[in-house]
Amino acid sequence: MKRSNTKIMASGPITSWEIDGKTMETVSDFIFLGSKITTDNDCSHEIKRRLLLGRKVMTKLDSIFKSRDITLPTKVHQVKATVFPVVMYGCESWTVKKAERQRIDAFELWCWRKLFRVPWTARRSNQSILKEISPGISFEGIMLKLKLQYFGHLMRRVDSLEKTLMLGRIGSRRRRGW
């Protein structure tokens, strides 16, 4: 373990940590396996970060989307295969609130509008764009499907801590008055 590169993050009352007399640097967030972990366990930062990464991928594919040689269904498949997975990485553990849901819907429609090269000033309804693309299932629907698949995966496991936590069967007694 290299002390100069090692940092700690604590979600409890621990404020500092010493190893061999040297205090370790404390951080409030870090990226672990591609996901942003914060001390307050709020996933809104991670959702915003993922949406920004999706925007970067979408803008890098701009030359493909402007090409007249590629058909619209191929472009739609390209978005679903390259942009959406970048955004949805780790979405099974997200707690999506109303504000994040609106951001996700806005991102999906931004992708489709960029695909059609419809400027934001154009008076074209979102429904007409969705009707023309006919994506089948919305971005939010895909995320819900992934969450349910993960939940089913957890429930099929025989003796796992995750299943016990999800079902609320922790073997302890409640304190009086709780």
Regions picked out by a protein language model, each given a short descriptive name:
Residues M1-W178:
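Short linear motifs embedded in intrinsically disordered, charge-biased segments
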